[in-house]
Amino acid sequence: MIYTSHYASPLGGMTLTSNGTALTGLYFDGERDFPHLSAAHKKDLPVFGEVMRWLDLYFAGKEPDFSPALNPTGTTFQMSVWAILQTIPFGETTTYGAIARHLEEETKKRMSAQAVGGAVGRNPISILIPCHRVIGANGSLTGYAGGLDKKEYLLELEGII
């Protein structure tokens, strides 16, 4: 069963999804990859309270010192990329190419920055899995499912730009 809740962020509304114990999605309302949730049930779950506390701290410009339970769903490759995203520290960035090189070292297989970009773009848990911290090799802000204006805001909030 899918459960939902809503969070009012400084960037607009966000929908949270959960399997009942962990966060499975965090989407800006209206973002391009927003899932169809007609079968979802609204419920007050402990994980939603934790995520909202985390987001309150984050949007106050503070680095939260705890991590709510996360359970994104994706391919093995996507999951490996998302695991790397979770290691990017607050206030820092990396590039798609750097993630590809990291995966090449781990797997001993060739990886392209474009493949990494595809996985980053399918991240179902915005902000907590910080895909906004991935930038182009030339330092440019590249795609973000919530929109480049939101990516820029998040990077400014973290003191990156």
Regions found by a protein language model. Give the residues of each.
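Short, positively charged loop/turn segments that connect secondary-structure elements
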Residues: 104-118
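…primarily DNA-binding HTH/wHTH and HhH modules…
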Residues: 137-161
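N-terminal positioning helix adjacent to the helix-turn-helix/winged-helix DNA-binding module
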Residues: 77-81, 112, 150
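Short cysteine clusters
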Residues: 131
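Major-groove DNA-recognition helix of helix-turn-helix-type DNA-binding domains
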Residues: 120, 128
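Basic nucleic-acid-binding alpha-helical/helix-turn surface characteristic of O6-alkylguanine DNA
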Residues: 1-107, 158-161
